[in-house]
Curated annotation (Swiss-Prot):
Spans traversing the lipid bilayer: none
GO MF term set: (3R)-hydroxyacyl-[acyl-carrier-protein] dehydratase activity
Keywords: Cytoplasm, Lipid A biosynthesis, Lipid biosynthesis, Lipid metabolism, Lyase
Assigned protein family: Belongs to the thioester dehydratase family. FabZ subfamily.
Chain segments annotated as coiled-coil in the UniProt record: none
Compartments it resides in: Cytoplasm
Reaction it catalyzes: a (3R)-hydroxyacyl-[ACP] = a (2E)-enoyl-[ACP] + H2O
Protein name (database record): 3-hydroxyacyl-[acyl-carrier-protein] dehydratase FabZ
Broad EC category: lyase
InterPro entries with a match to the protein in the record: FabA_FabZ, FabZ, HotDog_dom_sf
Amino acid sequence: MLDITEIKKIIPHRYPMLLIDRVEELIPGEKAVAKRNVTINEELFNGHFPGNPVMPGVLIVEALAQTGAVALLSLPEFKGKTAYFGGIKSAKFRKVVRPGDSLRLEVTLEKIRNNVGLGKAIATVDGKKACTAELTFMIG
């Protein structure tokens, strides 16, 4: 398991855009499973939506991307680099994520060639799918 200090050694994201709290499983170059504890104290809930707080879908996808970046950037050849979005395909949102939810983020890398990685991503809350997507990463 990686705590927030160890995550920050792998990916460059910082508050307020660091969207994963811990990594529970890591197989470098293959898979990462992370957690995000969604709290009402996050500034974004003041406007999304007042009286009906919902985590924006784009931030769920970003949290998945950060999880995938941990899996990629844990490889020795990518240490110290940055993983950028190369593409988002087939993103589907199936469940609303609210404050108090614990978001489980899982990314399985299916292909890595040169500086490009492809992965399947799934976010769940209480075992129910909240978001699925196919992500492309560019390593720079």
